[in-house]
Amino acid sequence: MDALKPWHLYLLLCRNGSYYAGITNDLERRFQAHLRGTGARYTRANPPVQMLASHPYPDRASASRAECALKRLPRARKLAWLQAQPRTVHESQPADASITRV
């Protein structure tokens, strides 16, 4: 059944003001892992404050390619990517509550 789930590229805002981009096929589970400190090494050192946006992809390969492209962008271009995402993806709320969207 997991093979049918879309993959998502997501962008987190970290406590130090930096962004973290990653991919997952379960946004809520992955975000909670980052909050617990069991996600990525980067987010253990720089805990996330909120999930800013996500974008679905049909498979892991396309999500991974998009992640690599996003990570190569300068901060201003990452903001442009964020602003281009649909506003219905997530609603703003504190990181300790759930996934967020500004």
Swiss-Prot record:
InterPro entries noted in UniProt: GIY-YIG_endonuc, GIY-YIG_endonuc_sf, UPF0213_domain
Top-level taxon: Bacteria
Any coiled-coil regions, as ranges: none
GIY-YIG domain span: 5-80
Pfam families documented for this protein: GIY-YIG
Similarity comment text for this entry: Belongs to the UPF0213 family.
Name of the protein described by the UniProt record: UPF0213 protein XAC3202
Annotated organism of origin: Xanthomonas axonopodis pv. citri (strain 306)
